[in-house]
Amino acid sequence: MSDFEYSRNTVPKLDRSEVITWFHQVLGHPGQTRLRETLQQRYYHPKLRGQIDKFRCEHCQRYKLSGKGYGLLPEREIRIAPWEEVAIDLIGPWKVKVNNKPCEFSALTCIDTASNLVELVRIDTKTSEHIRDKFAQTWLCRYPRPIRCVHDKGGEFIGREFQWLLELFSIKDVCSTSKNPQSNAICERMHQTVENVLRVIIHGNPPKTMSKAKDIVDDALATAMHAMRTTVATTLGS
């Protein structure tokens, strides 16, 4: 047994199934590859890999989107220090039926381009003022002030209210015509993860009020963030 294997917890036979199921649910119903790599970073058993490969989730088989997945994010070297640059974008919309009436929800995503740390927050409107407030609450109030803020030419980002916030904090405005490929890939993964989580949560228990629908979307966003932070990051090799 290698030193790496000694550093991990051993999972008894009777507990393996429960551990696999628990991690699969907590990580937002990931695919087998991501589930296997994440579990094998923490636990050891000679038959663990085989049992993970045989694991089947009834909810995933019935309600997750079918077709080609988003795959792995490409590895790359870190060329900037953490907290220097944040890339922001909007993801969604996701459709949720409330009393059989379709409603749409979107979210603001903020990504530290060095570490790939992600923050997600549901938005009510796409106005520059609302996005400004959400960015301040979600990122600026929690982390060191970034040097640069990268975004596309969406009106919510180039609007007067959002630009005022960047000037107030002396953050360099970087309006990119071509989105950051790395951040764009993360946004796509976020979108699909949230949508899959929503499908699993909502099935059999559709929200009857708008308040309940918002709570469900918030739970899905939190699950997606947790999944991104705790699963193996292929871009950083850890």
Could you tell me what each predicted segment is?
Residues 151-153, 157-166, 173-196, 217:
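RNase H-like two-metal-ion nuclease catalytic core shared by retroviral integrases
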Residues 1-118, 123, 140-147, 228, ...:
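RNase H-like DDE catalytic core and adjacent DNA/metal-binding regions
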